[in-house]
Amino acid sequence: MLLKKIRPHLFYALATLTAALPAAASAQTLKSGDVAVLASYYEIRGSDCLALRAPRLSLTMMPRLGKASVMQTRGQSSDSGRCAYQTVPVSQLVYQADQAGSDTLAWEVKYQNKTLGTRRYSATVVVTPGP
């Protein structure tokens, strides 16, 4: 009986904790010469759906086999939730694959929202020889 009462709360606590943990390293495969957006970030104040300035994105570990750059653009928020499809300023991490091999890069994202704070991410890009 006690387990039935606790289970929904335990599930909610675990889901919240999982959402708060930093993202694990991700992997993507590209061909030499390809250009890809590895990550895009925006920030919306949820209470009134106000689009805030794009989060500050900075590279903390540069790739060895390709080039990475930070681009500022405008885009749309996700397609779900109360603030869906809002036009927002976006920071993007763009990677250009040069040499074949496994390349790793890392970056951090600084949000205006103190709860989100600064988040750190990394990615491994596998580059295969181009055509």
PLM segments and residue spans:
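N-terminal secretory signal peptides that target proteins for export/translocation
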Residues: 1-7
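Bacterial N-terminal signal peptides
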Residues: 11-20
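Extracellular interdomain linkers/hinges and stalk-like, low-complexity segments
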Residues: 25-62, 114-131
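Surface-exposed or secretory-pathway low-complexity segments enriched in glycine-proline
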Residues: 49-87
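A generic structural micro-feature
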Residues: 84-89, 99, 117
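Extracellular/luminal low-complexity segments enriched in Ser/Thr/Pro
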Residues: 92-102
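Beta-strand-rich extracellular modules
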Residues: 108-112
